[in-house]
């Protein structure tokens, strides 16, 4: 339906408004720069550990920084998207239905290894935003 389509469109517009693409590029450049500096330092002092460092740094920086940052951006886009839907006159309650429909047939999964919040957390957080909008309107 139109309201659920607005959920997707407003979510993607929110990514653009929040400049998530630019943030991702910056984060990636920082990650690579720090990794390069670390790799050079290890190569200069203990070259036998350079490969191990590179693998550990790559895994650690992705799990510890990049994935959580991506989940935060997704949650932020969800929240901004709900406000955009509300301002445009769409039924924001359809957003939770949309994300529930999207999660059908998928396992619950673990946020830790994902770029997106779990469906359960996502719908809970979206409902919180919807409730906040309802309270602000009163």
Where are these regions (language model features)?
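A Zn2+-metalloprotease active-site environment signal
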Residues: 1-138
